[in-house]
């Protein structure tokens, strides 16, 4: 969460103080207007479990035996890319700056996975991060 806040602040400074939101955040906000329960289940339960199993449990673990640095980079970069790819393919190249934020979170989750030797901790961190994001969107 701290990584996200710091990197989003840097991004806003780079963009000249713009308050542009990431495509991922805009998607969250669109769900808020439709079905909060669906958004909660998808964002706080399903996405963290599936994303951590894919990026830490499969990608990082598979690549770590080949090259630890490559494993960290691939896991974090692909995690970040997942959160912006739809906007990029729609032509919004400004979303590239959010690779810093999402990739940073991916790095923190990967580091935690490696140090704790369990996928449960980054899953829980990811769940808490997404829950805090939803709470902030609902009450702000």
Can you say where each PLM-predicted feature lies in the sequence?
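Transmembrane helix-loop-helix hairpins at the membrane interface
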Residues: 5-9, 33-140
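Membrane-interface interhelical connector segments
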Residues: 13-33
